[in-house]
Amino acid sequence: LSPGTAKTLVEALADGGRARIKGQLAEVPLGWKVRRIDFGAGPQWAMTIPWGDVTTAWQSTGIANIQVFVPTPRWLIWAAKAGNVTRPLMSLPAIQGYLKSLVDRRVKGPDEQTRARLTTHVWGEARNGAGEQRVIRLRTANGYALTVDGALAVRRFIEDQAPAPGCYTPSKLCGAQLVEELPGSGRFEVSEC
């Protein structure tokens, strides 16, 4: 976790969680849903978090109900749930300042060697109205490298293809396969449940 990411999380504490419910962006409690998920390296506890994917995935797919899960130690899940009680305090400038100063003192972020060693395991689950279910998994480079490589790939695509002006998610602009073409990425693996 980089200091910048940690500070973004501190800022988000006061806002609670987010999910897409029946096509609408909805506020939900922190740690709203908890379950065990095999992201690709064995089952782990995971909880919902308010990442931007609840918006971008909806823009890309039109899927009406979207939650984003991240692997989380159980103690942190319970801390997030307990944090729902103290959420009103989290927006106070003094609390924000104190928590960010803790980040400055304690969070150093992954160094280059650590980042080179890390991979990201992405998991998705979809169900249709008939109850059919599919799971998709993807292994990529660490999140920092993926972000840089993805941004550069989109830039090259725009330069080469000159798409119509507008607002796009990367998959709507370049196709879902873009992520498979990035350094350190594998292929999508789809399975029935």
Q: Regions from the language model: what does each represent?
A:
Residues 111-193:
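C-terminal helical cap and adjacent loop that interface with cofactors, partners, or active-site loops
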Residues 1-127, 132-135, 145:
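Active-site-lining helix/loop region of Rossmann-like oxidoreductase modules
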